[in-house]
A protein has these predicted regions:
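Conserved AMP-binding A3 loop
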Residues: 19-43
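Conserved AMP-binding/adenylation subdomain of ANL enzymes
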Residues: 42-60, 68-108, 123
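Conserved ATP-binding/catalytic segment of the ANL
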Residues: 208-272
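Gly/Ser/Thr-rich phosphate-binding loop
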Residues: 82, 99, 104-113, 121-196, ...
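Structural detector for helix-capping/boundary residues
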Residues: 16, 38-39, 59, 65, ...
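Conserved S/T- and glycine-rich ATP-binding loop of Class I adenylate-forming
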Residues: 18, 24-27, 61, 67, ...
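Short beta-strand->loop structural element characteristic of the AMP-binding/adenylate-forming
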Residues: 32-35, 63-64, 85-92, 160
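Conserved pre-ATP/AMP-binding loop-to-beta segment of ANL
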Residues: 5-23, 30, 53-60
Length: 272
């Protein structure tokens, strides 16, 4: 039986306090403990449930990703907690059992990573693969070369691909359901020239970063502001290494995502 009152400690908890630590994947160095605040958790859970998956208490989320990583924990379990949806939680992904479980447990939504979708695309096709309750999925790393095949084969209506890092201050989400994109962001970002061979940002004669031409690949930076806070790592030295200072003006600060991106024309622009 639940108490009608919040626990006493909630009076002393703020949105900026640390909720948990999540270790980064280690793609740009050794894994580091990233700090996730209550703010980050609540924003991610709310965004996933309402704007990404668009799920409610009548839905069920198929979740086979580890809960010690942000995708499974924040976008999967977080969406269920925020919306009231139920979850089918599998300890380990199984391509051979996937469709049977989706049908048996009436899963309407799924959280994915790209490799999971590739495995499901590569297994032998069956005539009734699209005959299942799954209609909306959210995750990251869906490759363009399998995107449409996977979507059509399994009868998926909505693929909400997202981009973000456990420690990052900006994220993108394909909220408008535009195929083969990571969508959009409301945060202030910059795509700047980057020398891949020398692994360094290209700066002009004044020491400033240079924006790439429209559609050209470049390094993604996210401006650090009161609204887009870089919460960093438990290691302050590692935190500082990810900050690009004086990029476009004296005193500015930007989070270095370490990822190359390019813009694509989807037929419209959104203003904020």
């Amino acid at each position: 039986e639940l108490s009608e009152e919040n626990p006493a400690q909630t009076n002393d908890t703020t949105i900026g306090e640390t909720a948990l630590y999540i270790y980064t994947s280690g793609t740009t160095g050794l894994p580091k403990a990233a700090i996730l605040s209550n703010r980050r958790y609540l924003i991610a859970a709310d965004m996933s449930s309402k704007a990404g998956l668009n799920c409610n208490a009548n839905d069920r989320i198929y979740l086979c990703l580890p809960l010690y990583h942000a995708t499974g924990l924040l976008l999967g379990a977080g969406a269920a907690f925020a919306s009231g949806a139920s979850m089918f939680v599998r300890r380990k992904f199984s391509a051979s059992n996937f469709l049977r479980e989706v049908r048996e447990y009436n899963c309407t939504h799924m959280i994915y990573i790209g490799e999971l979708c590739r495995y499901l695309t590569n297994i032998p096709a069956q005539a009734d693969d699209a005959s299942n309750p799954l209609h909306s999925i959210m995750g990251n790393g869906m490759r363009p070369d399998i995107w449409m095949d996977f979507k059509n084969r399994y009868g998926i209506n909505r693929v909400c691909e997202f981009y973000g890092a456990s420690e990052g201050n900006v994220s993108f989400a394909n909220l408008m359901n535009k195929d083969m994109t990571v969508g959009m962001t409301s945060a202030e970002v910059a795509v700047v020239e980057y020398d891949v061979d020398n692994d360094e940002i290209v700066r002009d004669q004044n020491g400033r970063c240079q924006l790439v031409a429209e559609g050209e690949p470049g390094l993604l930076l996210g401006k650090i502001t009161p609204d887009t806070v870089f919460e960093g790592y438990t290691d302050s030295e590692a935190t500082e290494k990810k900050v690009i200072r004086d990029a476009f003006a004296d005193g500015d600060a930007w989070f270095n995502t370490g990822d190359l991106m390019r813009t694509v024309d989807v037929g419209f622009n959104l203003g904020y």
